[in-house]
């Protein structure tokens, strides 16, 4: 079976994958960035989607916060129109522009947690935003390198997940990501 990791340019709220990942904060507040966009697209009402997310967090984890590597799954609601079956919330590290081995390990946990949950749910395709590269301030190049490394290893052992997408909204970020993994100006995957 062919497996693939692909970097694409687009809007994750309109991306066609069985699961999309939300780069959430530890309390699932969905107050800004991609978390706000996903909540708005899923429900139309961010506060309602936040309420649903918090209820699911308490039900699934038995607490009111997520640690690095933990995930919460919520229904896709309106995102179902794009073929989305699940929204998987994970928490990446806050960098504030400073990258370290500790931040890398926390990001690996966040990515791997979402991938494992998707595999457990029988998902074949999953789309990620650049976790921690936005308002959390981690360098995009480091985030992309970490994604590539984690996904490459995970796809060797995955039972169901066959397609992993890193969806970048801006053309600038998309081009930088392709350059980072040595693809230049094309959209091939490695």
From Swiss-Prot:
Q: Which domain of life is it from?
A: Archaea
Pfam family of this protein, just one? Macro
- Kindly give the Gene3D superfamilies that the UniProt entry links to this protein: Leucine Aminopeptidase, subunit E, domain 1
Protein source organism: Pyrococcus horikoshii (strain ATCC 700860 / DSM 12428 / JCM 9974 / NBRC 100139 / OT-3)
Q: Where is the Macro domain?
A: 1-185
Record protein name field: Uncharacterized protein PH1513
Query: Which residue ranges traverse the bilayer?
Result: none
Q: Which SMART domains match?
A: A1pp (SM00506)
């Amino acid at each position: 079976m062919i497996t693939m990791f692909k970097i694409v340019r687009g809007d994750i709220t309109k991306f066609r994958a069985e699961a999309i990942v939300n780069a959430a904060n530890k309390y699932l507040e969905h107050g800004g960035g991609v978390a706000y966009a996903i909540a708005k697209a899923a429900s139309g009402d961010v506060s309602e989607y936040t309420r649903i997310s918090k209820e699911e967090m308490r039900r699934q984890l038995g607490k009111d916060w997520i640690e690095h590597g933990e995930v919460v799954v919520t229904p896709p609601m309106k995102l179902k129109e794009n073929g989305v079956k699940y929204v998987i919330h994970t928490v990446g590290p806050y960098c504030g522009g400073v990258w370290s081995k500790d931040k890398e390990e926390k990001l690996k946990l966040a990515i791997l947690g979402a991938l494992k949950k998707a595999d457990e749910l029988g998902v074949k395709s999953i789309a990620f935003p650049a976790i921690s590269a936005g308002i959390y301030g981690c360098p995009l190049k480091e985030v992309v390198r970490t994604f590539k490394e984690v996904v490459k290893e995970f796809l060797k052992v995955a039972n169901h997940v066959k397609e992993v997408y890193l969806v970048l909204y801006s053309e600038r970020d998309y081009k930088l990501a392709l350059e980072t993994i040595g693809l230049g100006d094309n959209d091939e995957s490695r």
